């Protein structure tokens, strides 16, 4: 069997000892990973790039919209989507399915977290957001929040054009523990800094630039948040990067240099071929 992390491999080995780890990888020559970042305003663009199943993870950030300096920070929620259906079970036993209303989308729940229920943005911006103009990226580029709609899978990584640092909170549970470090890899190849949960795959090989006690490690590749400090450390690190352009750049460069060869699709495919050949030769 093959899997993507040594953490997941240890779980699988409880049932099958023959496990080989091949991490997720990226082809840097793919067009969506080869685009430069859009020019930024005077705000640090803090990205949230995830799917529709992360509400419990993002709820760890409740209150963050009022903890960061909104004059220096912009949250960019990428992947916004209002598609979906709702099933209604009637008293007479009939079952009815209907398209959801835009405001019923889980993405609106995400949005409320990063706007303090729309209190941190201007009335004009809120009016625009409430129109739910699907596919029209948010033109309010200098507000404390920006909405970016879902994109085709072949253009997914272009979201990173509008992100300086990605945040990846994870609620501690068995499912999240065995996830791969894909977000870390995406950030590296797109020259994006990374703030992640000090849990699961992000503990495999990331080196925190801010160590316990506040010591700075110039070789660090990320900022990692302890689960016991979810209530304050996310905002602390975001505000730090908003004030420290040198640290932001160093994190972006260090992570890129760490992933560019280690997680290249060509390199991982080469490892796969060599492994499969070794199996054939044994037989």
Where are these regions (language model features)?
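Donor nucleotide-sugar binding/catalytic pocket of nucleotide-sugar-dependent glycosyltransferases
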Residues: 1-33
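Short, polar loop motifs at secondary-structure junctions
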Residues: 4-9, 79-83, 198-201
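Short loop/helix-cap segments at secondary-structure boundaries that form the rim of catalytic
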Residues: 10-15, 87-90, 203-207
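Conserved catalytic-core segment of nucleotide-activated headgroup transferases in glycan assembly
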Residues: 27-33, 38-161
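Glycosyltransferase donor-binding loop in the core domain
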Residues: 50-53, 179, 226, 260
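Nucleotide-sugar-dependent
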Residues: 56, 145, 149-159, 164-189, ...
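A charged, aromatic-enriched C-terminal amphipathic alpha-helix characteristic of glycosyltransferases
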Residues: 229, 233, 243-278
């Amino acid at each position: 069997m093959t899997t993507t992390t040594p953490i997941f491999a240890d779980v699988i080995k409880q049932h099958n000892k023959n496990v080989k780890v091949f991490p997720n990888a990226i082809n840097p020559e793919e067009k969506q990973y080869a685009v430069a970042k859009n020019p930024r305003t005077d705000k640090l663009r803090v990205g949230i790039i995830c799917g529709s199943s992360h509400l419990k993870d993002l709820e760890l950030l409740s209150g963050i919209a009022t903890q960061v300096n909104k004059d220096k920070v912009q949250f960019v929620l990428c992947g916004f989507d209002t598609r979906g259906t709702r099933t209604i079970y009637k008293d007479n036993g009939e079952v009815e399915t209907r398209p959801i209303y835009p405001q019923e989308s889980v993405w609106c729940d995400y949005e409320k977290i990063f706007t303090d229920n729309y209190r941190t943005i201007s009335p004009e911006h809120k009016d625009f957001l409430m129109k739910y103009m699907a596919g029209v990226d948010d033109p309010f580029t200098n507000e404390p929040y920006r909405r970016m709609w879902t994109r085709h899978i072949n253009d997914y990584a272009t979201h990173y054009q509008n992100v300086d640092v990605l945040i990846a909170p994870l609620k501690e549970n068995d499912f999240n523990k065995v996830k791969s470090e894909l977000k870390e890899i995406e950030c590296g190849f797109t020259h994006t800094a990374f703030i992640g949960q000090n849990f699961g795959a992000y503990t495999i090989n990331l080196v925190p630039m801010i160590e316990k006690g506040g010591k700075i490690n110039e070789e660090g590749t990320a900022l990692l948040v302890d689960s016991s400090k979810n209530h304050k450390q996310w905002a602390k690190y975001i505000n730090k990067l908003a004030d420290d352009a040198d640290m932001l750049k160093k994190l972006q460069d260090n992570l890129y240099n760490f992933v560019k060869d280690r997680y290249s699709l060509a390199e991982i495919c080469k490892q796969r071929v060599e492994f499969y050949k070794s199996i054939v030769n044994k037989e």
